[in-house]
Amino acid sequence: MNKNYKDTLLMPSTDFEMKANLATKESKIQQKWLDDQIYQLRLEKNQNNEQKILHDGPPYANGDIHVGHTMNKILKDVIVRRWLMQGYYSPFILGWDTHGLPIEHAVQSKLGQKEFFKLSVLERIEVCRDFAFNQVQKQKEQFSSLGLVTDFKVCYHTYDKQYEIDQLKVFAKMINEGLVYQDYKPIYWSWSSKSVLSDAEIEYKETKSPSIYVTFKTLDNEVIGKDVNLVIWTTTPWTLPSNLAISVHPELEYTLFEVNGQKYLVGSNLYEQLIAKFNFENPKVIQKLKGSSLDKIKYQHCLYDQITGIVVLGEHVSDSDGTGLVHTAPGFGLEDFIVCKKYGIDAYVPINDEGCFDQTVHDPELVGVFYDDANKLIAQKLEARNCLLSLNFINHQAAHDWRTKKPVIYRATKQWFINIKSIKNQLVENINTVKYPNERYAKRMLSMVAERSDWCISRQRTWGLPIPIIFDENHEPILDKELIDNTLRIMEAEGIKAWYEHDAKYFLTNKYDPRKTYYKESDILDVWFDSGTSFNVLKENGIKDKATIYFEGSDQYRGWFNSSMICATVLNKTAPYKELISHGFTLDEKGMKMSKSQGNVISPLTIIKNKGADILRLWAASIDYSNDHRIGNHIIEQNSEIYRKIRNSLFRYILGNLNDFDFKPLDQYQLSLADLLTINHVNKSFKKIDQAYLNYDYLEITKEVNQMVVELSAWYFELIKDSLYCNDENDPTRKAIQATLNYIFINSLFRIAPILVHTAEEAYSHYQATNKEKSVYLIDPPALFEIKTDLDLDQLATEFSKLKDDVYAEIEKLRKDKVLAKSNEAVVYLSKQYLDINKHLVKQLKTWLNVAEVHFTKNDQITVEKTDFSKCLRCWNYFKELSKNNNEVCQRCSELV
């Protein structure tokens, strides 16, 4: 007869394409979300439900988004989508950090520095605002290509008027609580930025520095006598012209010794080590004494005869390295500054904003010399004066400006500070209320607060929020609540520009004499203060509770996590977030930091253009984000392969086999044992995925999804093809299989949708169920099917899996030897170990193994041979006898053709 039986089969049919074409489709899907207002509809649907809020930490509004940005935003989007799909009210409000030096520098580069500074302050602010606005618009467009579940019209920017006013109200509260003060003390100074820097704006890089040992001779005293060489060690020779004291620890022991007619003093614990270092021969110990006995001994400066200093007592001194005596320049070190303050010694700072020695230095040869260049000249002078014992060079980690990448110095300047010490206990208490992934994160947050000094909040820049403080005629700040409140009222009514448009008297209240002279502060607030008050945005958008979670890079423990905690503790007496998680940094495929100079920068926009955002999203969900992680062409290709499995082996396979399904509830079908085993198996996967979502463990989710697809494809999806394609359309077994597939589809789709957002929407659009929602993102969570059976499905699955693996191993040998083309040609003789196999499996084995025959034997080994049965030309299975009515097909197929 040789009929074409293919036309009689119920083959899969769906318009859901095998080839994704994501780069083409994604923008259309995004536009449909906008047109249908899917995000707004979901929020409306959930509006009376419990709130869960992820507060978006604002990225800096400068330049194209990079792969680190995209990883961060994708994972945040996954969190929020999952919450929304579970029914929580979870608006996702994106933010941008828009003030600060990088924008100022970018505008200066664009206009030219001379032209920039020809502008008035208000004009400079306006051009910076315009630049920031354009950068935000560009980044919004780029972020939108990721398919984020947000409204880009409802965002926050730190230059927004209401944002700025809310920020100033936090500052005013700090003033009213006595936390704000002005002081002159050393802090990080960036000569390349001409501004102070916060701890969060510092990065450490390996640097080569001089390591020198220098002597200062004592003046006449009754403790150790005249002309004793006090030995100090320093890696900053350029600070020696500013030396005003030498610190010793009051409790440490010091050794006075003599070599070649010269007397020296060093810490006793370092004596032997230093003798060897300086190649001193036959030293003679004269005396050992406590540091406290050296207090206020005077000495001659190592460089200048007209300058003297004194020995001071400091608890910061150590005898683990150096000499046990510490060169002390209060203008260039915080500990130096603190110890000298106790002795009434003021800071001396002969270095200007550009990092060069100014006219106040005691040495005319140093005037105008850059501090780092002065090291060589100073070393030469020390050697000429016989004050240089040793000079070497060492590599060590030194502080650098994170934006300009140039070294920074500690330098005393007059700045505004927040007194952290007085609120540390409250900070620790609030930090301990936060939930962390593990104790390591909690300790990290606590250590940042424990180690934190007072927060310097003033910056010498233009583009930012002004510090609204007025000074009296003596240049003393007026920290008066009534005056501060009045200033804020004016700025709220007229805008921040009022601070620059009016003189100081405009802001005075009636109690101040307008005939006197007043001054305005010209500094602006630290940008970390800007972003640190962003929690106010939630209240402005009708969110009553604090954020559920903050999720940013691990560098934010000393940055945004920290500044937010401080600001919220002052304003609300509570932490700004309930949970805190962080991620590492994105490296290239070799584990190297990306940089333009290395040529290893991977653009997320290129990946989106070539592969699609869903591939990038899958990558972000498949990394261990808690640590540094990698990306590269090979890694993206691996994720593309996993994506293809999910798209085709799961979504497309199922959709193709649901084209004639009736979509009734699962319990209305006669589910087979294979169906039940499969439902039981996928339920385990779904529960693991649900738990992983609770733990923010997306790597576990992608692993579980991939494993589930592999396992379904390896057995159940192969097993059911015969019934799906060859049985009657309305056959109960076939309908039960379709019901099982439908169950797997909607539950898988629901769980994969927060990650593969465009693909999930596309798949849902081809899903033919009745009473569908407009979007997959509007569906309710599907309930897990509760299997009611007395059978131990787990045990059955384990038993069958073991048997299947053993049988397939033997079949594979014959396939390699070309004896078998397919497994359904095999006759299987089971070994004696399977004689006691579960009775429920016995009658299923031929079908479940997809073989021609199964025989039980008492043999020691499983054996396989090729069947001599006849092949049905319709279903391609092998039978001892074909249909009597049609000897080309089996009995079942004969009845259907």
UniProtKB/Swiss-Prot annotation:
In the record, biological process GO terms are: isoleucyl-tRNA aminoacylation
Kindly list the positions annotated as binding ATP: 596
Name the coenzymes or cofactors required: Zn(2+)
Q: Give its E.C. classification number.
A: 6.1.1.5
Q: What does the entry list under GO cellular component?
A: cytosol
InterPro entries assigned? aa-tRNA-synth_I_CS, aa-tRNA-synth_Ia, Anticodon_Ile_BEm, Ile-tRNA-ligase, Ile-tRNA-ligase_type1, Ile-tRNA_ligase, M/V/L/I-tRNA-synth_anticd-bd, Rossmann-like_a/b/a_fold
Pfam families xrefs: Anticodon_1, tRNA-synt_1, zf-FPG_IleRS
Molecular function (GO) terms for this protein are:
aminoacyl-tRNA deacylase activity; ATP binding; isoleucine-tRNA ligase activity; tRNA binding; zinc ion binding
Sequence positions that bind L-isoleucyl-5'-AMP: 552
Q: How is the cofactor bound?
A: Binds 1 zinc ion per subunit.
Residues reported to bind Zn(2+): 872, 875, 890, 893
| UniProt short sequence motif 'KMSKS' region, positions renumbered to this chain | 593-597
Subcellular localization(s) per the UniProt record: Cytoplasm
What's the main place this protein lives?
A: cytoplasm
Sorted keywords for this record are:
Aminoacyl-tRNA synthetase, ATP-binding, Cytoplasm, Ligase, Metal-binding, Nucleotide-binding, Protein biosynthesis, Zinc
Keyword Protein biosynthesis in record: yes
PANTHER family cross-referenced by the UniProt entry:
ISOLEUCINE--TRNA LIGASE, MITOCHONDRIAL (PTHR42765:SF1), SOLEUCYL-TRNA SYNTHETASE (PTHR42765)
Q: Which family does it belong to?
A: Belongs to the class-I aminoacyl-tRNA synthetase family. IleS type 1 subfamily.
Q: Which NCBIfam families match?
A: ileS
What quaternary arrangement does the UniProt entry report? Monomer.
How does the record comment on the protein's domains? IleRS has two distinct active sites: one for aminoacylation and one for editing. The misactivated valine is translocated from the active site to the editing site, which sterically excludes the correctly activated isoleucine. The single editing site contains two valyl binding pockets, one specific for each substrate (Val-AMP or Val-tRNA(Ile)).
Under what name is this protein listed? Isoleucine--tRNA ligase
Gene source species: Mycoplasmoides gallisepticum (strain R(low / passage 15 / clone 2)) (Mycoplasma gallisepticum)
